[in-house]
């Protein structure tokens, strides 16, 4: 019940919803969501948290007298498609149970699809090209996933959305190029026998910029 809807399938849904006028608002909310927020404010409140798999059954078991299965399913479907909820998933926040305890990390595929959908919605409201920001977020999601570049690219590849595939490829290429630069800088630093401050000055870098690049390279080495 908590699987996030892929951005590719939501494009047509969103366009259809936009044409239904007053029905749109009704579909974006459900009276049961207010009740869920009272019962579990840490999950359904102003700052939603990713829900554990099986939360539907947990809610029915805990609130059997108050909940109807069909209404709960409708409410959860609306909730897990909301931008606030998808933003939490896109951040890679852990999935939580009804007690608010973190129980598992979202799957890399869910994080990636949430990123695409959140940025698609933001781009519709913004004149700014959000592509560069999305590519950076995809790169960060890849690096946090623990997958190799090829495995991540294969897992996130869409059979229908070539625009998303192009964005994915560009993000991974940019990230790989930056990682290569960081690694080269770290090797040069290690061979220089200089302090980080002196090394940054020698290369014309701001000390904080050099420190961040060296830290990224060390972190990347630790993953290999």
Q: Residue locations for each model-derived region?
A:
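Residues within the helices of the helix-turn-helix
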Residues: 57, 186, 197
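N-terminal, leucine/charged-rich tether regions that mediate assembly and partner docking
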Residues: 2-73, 77, 81, 86-95, ...
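Short, solvent-exposed alpha-helical "recognition" segments
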Residues: 178, 211-224
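Short, amphipathic alpha-helical "recognition" segments used to contact nucleic acids or chromatin
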Residues: 176-193
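General nucleic-acid-binding
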Residues: 98-154
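Short alpha-helical "recognition helix" segments of helix-turn-helix
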Residues: 59, 152, 198-201
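Short, basic interhelical loop/turn and adjoining N-cap
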Residues: 65-69, 197-216
């Amino acid at each position: 019940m908590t699987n996030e809807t892929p951005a590719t399938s939501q494009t047509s849904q969103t366009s259809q919803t936009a044409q239904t006028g007053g029905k749109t608002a009704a579909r974006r909310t459900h009276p049961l969501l207010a009740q869920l927020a009272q019962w579990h404010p840490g999950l359904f409140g102003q700052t939603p948290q990713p829900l554990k798999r099986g939360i539907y059954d947990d809610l029915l078991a805990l609130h059997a007298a108050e909940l109807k299965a069909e209404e709960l399913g409708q409410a959860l479907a609306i909730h897990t498609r909301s931008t606030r909820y998808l933003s939490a998933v896109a951040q890679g926040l852990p999935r939580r149970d009804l007690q608010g305890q973190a129980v598992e990390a979202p799957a890399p595929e869910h994080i990636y699809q949430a990123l695409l959908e959140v940025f698609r919605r933001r781009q519709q409201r913004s004149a700014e090209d959000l592509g560069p920001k999305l590519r950076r977020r995809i790169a960060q999601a890849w690096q946090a996933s623990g997958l190799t570049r090829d495995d991540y690219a294969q897992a996130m590849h869409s059979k229908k959305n070539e625009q998303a595939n192009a964005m994915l490829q560009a993000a991974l290429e940019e990230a790989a190029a930056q990682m290569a630069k960081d690694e080269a800088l770290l090797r040069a630093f290690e061979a220089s026998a200089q302090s980080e401050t002196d090394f940054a000055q020698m290369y014309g870098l701001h000390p904080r910029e050099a420190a961040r690049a060296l830290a990224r390279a060390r972190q990347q080495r630790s993953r290999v």
